[in-house]
Amino acid sequence: MRILVAMSGGVDSSVVAGLLKSQGHDVIGVTMKLWEGPNGEMPETGCCTAADSEDARKVAAKLDIPYYVLDYTASFSENVINNFVDMYSQGLTPNPCVECNRSVKFDHFIDQAKKLNCEKVATGHYAKIVRSNNSLELHKADYLEKDQSYVLHMLTADKLPKIDFPLGTISKPEVRQIAASLGLKTAFKKDSQDICFVGKKDYRNFVSSRIDFSSSGDIVDKDDNIIGTHEGVHELSLIHISEPTRQWQI
């Protein structure tokens, strides 16, 4: 079977490519360029960096599989970054990874797989697709510590037959062992937890740079007592805090 593997440059997607190749599949590696600097360059910090792309290229070379980098920066900016800024401007807290999976990654990967005559798209997510009552369902990974089904919940039923999550039954330590046994340079690479287009920077500065927040305000409790101030709703997340003697919302 010809399978398109989404390669991020991390150990998980590297092992997916290696496992599928070892099982005799015809594997094609693809990395999405989603975010770029002012001069069109890939970022140097966070995830989805130039170094990550280079790591993916080296893994593909080691495995002797074709490898491509595809530019989806326009789609990512329109669907993910704009949504991220807009939601914070409304006082909401977005999850950009969920929106990226919903409106960018899987649609484009499935479309690209079709163009390359691939039957499936495989990713390094920790989740499972299980057949139940003649239909496919998204389930949690066996290794719950790394389960990522929550960022995949938006996958529609028509997409599931076209997707494979080979790591759904494998633990993270096992993944690293497999990578080491295959001689992959990503075997002990650290996992990235950063928002790819924010990196190590403060997300509030990123949002402020893209929209004008000129109004500060008070933070009040349920009795309208002022308990603090804020510099704009984008700096706050909607939470509810309860204590024995007082309650407030932010």
PLM features: what roles do these ranges have?
Residues M1-H153, D164, E174, A180:
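ATP-dependent adenylation/nucleotidyltransferase module used to activate substrates
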Residues M154-K222:
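Internal nucleotide-binding/catalytic subdomain
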Residues I239-I250:
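Single conserved hydrophobic/aromatic residue that forms the stacking wall/gate
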Residues K128-I129, S216-H230:
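Active-site and channel-lining beta-strand-loop segments
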Residues Q148, Q193, Q247-Q249:
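Glutamine-centric residue-chemistry signal
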Residues G228-L238:
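Active-site loop ensemble at the mouth of alpha/beta enzyme cores that anchors a bound cofactor
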